[in-house]
Design a protein with these regions (language model features):
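N-terminal and secondary-structure boundary signal
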Residues: 1-200
Length: 201
């Protein structure tokens, strides 16, 4: 299946052709006839761990927020808590991390809502009846939003090789328990003939 890919040139002869202006215009084009006035728009992105630089910068996110507002939407930035221990495993630390990396109402023009609540236990269960899952868990604020818009950076991933848009939605929109369900497929497969019973694996 082929995807439509848009390219924004960095070349600009004046302010109206800047990358930021072009990003806002592209957002308007992509949302035209999809977004309804008054929609609560979840802008799903990754805020990064404190000091990490693998995230989309707030100045770019602000262009998307402004475009959504100009089209009558009510945007909020969101992500779900992580499964692993770190600075994004609960909503308080997650918000602190977002602020540390430059995300705040004053920098992006939209509130930040951690999608699965303080401890990662606010979710809705949805029946899908597919091969690997009969039911899935979706972070509550993602489920409750009228519209989902994702902003994704590409990164390396230990289990899949590459993480991007599918991971941002599939794993990133799941509460902690939903992430556990997805990671349940990754189980150790020790060679029993080499096992010495040390319990390290």
């Amino acid at each position: 299946m082929e995807s439509l890919v848009y390219f924004l040139s960095l070349r600009a002869e004046n302010e109206n052709q800047s990358l930021l202006r072009r990003l806002k215009n592209l957002t308007r084009i992509l949302l035209d006839e999809r977004l309804n006035k008054g929609d609560l728009v979840a802008i799903k992105l990754h805020f990064g761990e404190p000091g990490n630089h693998a995230f989309i910068r707030p100045i770019f996110v602000r262009q998307v927020v402004e475009a959504v507002k100009e089209m009558g939407g009510k945007p909020f930035l969101t992500d779900a808590n992580t499964l692993y221990k770190g600075m994004r495993s609960n909503a308080v630390d997650h918000l602190e991390s977002a602020i540390y990396n430059g995300f705040s109402y004053s920098s992006v023009g939209a509130p930040i809502i951690i999608a699965d609540g303080i401890y990662g236990d606010y979710f809705k269960e949805i029946e899908i009846n597919l091969k690997n899952f009969k039911k899935i868990r979706v972070a509550g604020a993602i489920h409750d939003a009228d519209f989902l818009l994702t902003l994704t950076h590409v990164k390396g991933h230990i289990g899949t090789g590459l993480g991007g848009a599918i991971k941002n939605v599939g794993m990133g929109c799941a509460p902690r328990s939903g992430k556990q369900m997805q990671h349940a497929q990754f189980k150790p497969d020790p060679n029993s003939s080499l096992c010495i019973g040390c319990s390290r694996c």
